């Protein structure tokens, strides 16, 4: 008995650290002519396995619905079908959708209604912005940080740190699919989430619900995409280069579109319709930067030369060469996400999600403009492995269990081995 109580306490305390990843749909269905409630009317979310029926009062409720835009269909024998298009489900929110059905003597008649997004959310108790995947696609940005800086109350410092309402970067809580994802070392996000992978982005500032127990100034809650019953794919790319005639910026006169590019692709669809779906994506990004130094000397004080032995030492008859320009603020990165959703039984959903990313970069150092070889390189690696299990107990309650492992590794060095002989001047 004591063991059971301990497990229950752990689950209750653990729930405080979980962010919302699903929404709720509810409403009342009546006969348009008589105003009487419709008992047993079917409510179906099209192209999904979600559905329910109305009770004796014409009321219905559906829980645990992933956030996105849906078409909701009301149908009942003896009435025209009523299809509501553009219904938006939001994480941690209740979407109210009522319906008035018209009696029909011809089977198959249908009425289509286009829903509109409410300008005011009456159940919101804090300052928040909710950005859907459709809105993200229309923004001229490629990083989550660029989306955040467009929101009210959010500022970005020179190092890229996110501040909300004047607080510190470590006071912002990041969550991915309801799981805390903040890096305990610097307060940033532990893994890189690409905009293409986000189904819904919530930016909350001010007061918070109890589920965000560790947040002080703000919460960034990201819900990643799931696969559906139809195959979908996308490819996004851009390429370019920095150009300037200002002599302050060296070596920006020649155009080379391979110096700055990004390629991302995604594919989703069914493995077994209505039972198993997948979502997979990847991105490669590179930039040689816009700040260049004239590489003139080696780390040992020699004039640059052809390092035929690749040891950075001037050996034997190796020939000296003219100084050359080299990037001082470059970066190169890749990331991938793979997610599989299982629906083995009605009301039971399993989700397995993996996110991997790696980044190499150098930061600009004014003192090393002529000695770029002495500049250290930064290495970032992030990994997220998550398992989510949810089960709907009744129209008004469900259970959810999240198990995850998150790793974030940051290193910065000139040579990987601290005992490397090249750290010593020959």
Positions of PLM-derived features:
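Flexible, surface-exposed loop regions and adjacent strand-edge segments
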Residues: 128, 132, 251-254, 294-310, ...
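Transmembrane beta-barrel strands of outer-membrane/channel proteins
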Residues: 115, 235-241, 280-286, 352-356, ...
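Periplasmic N-terminal accessory/gating domains of Gram-negative outer-membrane beta-barrel systems
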Residues: 80, 85-96, 110-210, 214-219, ...
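Structural signature of outer-membrane beta-barrel domains
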Residues: 80, 118-120, 169, 181, ...
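Short strand-turn segments of transmembrane beta-barrel domains in outer membranes
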Residues: 200-207, 218-221, 228-269, 282, ...
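Transmembrane beta-barrel wall of Gram-negative outer-membrane proteins
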Residues: 256-360, 380-397
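Periplasm-facing N-terminal accessory domains of Gram-negative outer-membrane beta-barrel systems
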Residues: 19-110, 114
């Amino acid at each position: 008995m004591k063991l059971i109580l301990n497990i229950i306490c752990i689950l209750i305390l653990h729930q405080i650290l979980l962010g919302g990843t699903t929404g709720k749909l509810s409403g009342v269905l009546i006969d348009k002519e008589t105003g009487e409630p419709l008992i047993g009317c079917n409510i179906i979310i099209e192209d999904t396995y979600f559905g329910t029926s109305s009770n004796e009062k014409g009321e219905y409720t559906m829980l645990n619905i992933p956030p996105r835009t849906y078409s909701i269909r009301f149908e009942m024998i003896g009435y025209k079908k009523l299809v509501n298009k553009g219904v938006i489900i939001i994480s941690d929110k209740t979407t109210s959708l009522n319906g008035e059905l018209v009696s029909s003597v011809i089977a198959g008649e249908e009425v289509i209604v286009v829903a509109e997004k409410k300008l005011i959310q009456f159940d919101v108790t804090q300052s928040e912005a909710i950005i859907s995947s459709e809105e993200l696609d229309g923004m001229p940005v490629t990083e989550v940080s660029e989306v955040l800086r467009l929101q009210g109350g959010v500022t970005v410092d020179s190092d890229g740190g996110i501040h909300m309402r004047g607080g510190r970067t470590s006071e912002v809580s990041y969550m991915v699919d309801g799981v805390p994802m903040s890096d305990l070392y610097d307060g940033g996000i532990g893994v890189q989430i690409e905009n293409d992978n986000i189904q819904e982005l919530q930016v909350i500032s001010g007061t918070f619900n109890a589920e965000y127990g560790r947040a002080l100034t703000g919460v960034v809650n990201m819900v990643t995409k799931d696969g559906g019953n139809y195959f979908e794919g996308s490819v996004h790319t851009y390429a370019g280069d920095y150009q300037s005639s200002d002599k302050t910026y060296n070596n920006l006169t020649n155009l080379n579109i391979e110096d700055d590019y990004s390629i991302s692709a995604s594919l989703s669809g069914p493995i077994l319709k209505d039972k198993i779906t997948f979502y997979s994506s990847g991105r490669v990004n590179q930039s040689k930067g816009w700040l260049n130094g004239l590489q003139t000397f080696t780390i040992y004080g020699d004039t640059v030369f052809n390092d035929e032995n690749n040891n950075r030492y001037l050996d034997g008859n190796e020939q000296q060469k003219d100084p050359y320009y080299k990037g001082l603020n470059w970066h190169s990165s890749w990331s991938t996400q793979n997610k599989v959703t299982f629906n083995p039984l009605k009301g039971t959903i399993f989700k397995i999600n993996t996110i991997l990313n790696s980044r190499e970069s150098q930061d600009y150092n004014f003192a090393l403009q002529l000695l770029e070889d002495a500049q250290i390189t930064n290495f970032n690696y992030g990994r997220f492995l998550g398992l989510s299990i949810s089960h709907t107990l009744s129209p008004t309650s469900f259970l959810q269990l999240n198990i995850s492992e998150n790793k974030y590794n940051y290193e910065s060095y000139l040579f990987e081995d601290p005992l490397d002989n090249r750290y010593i001047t020959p």
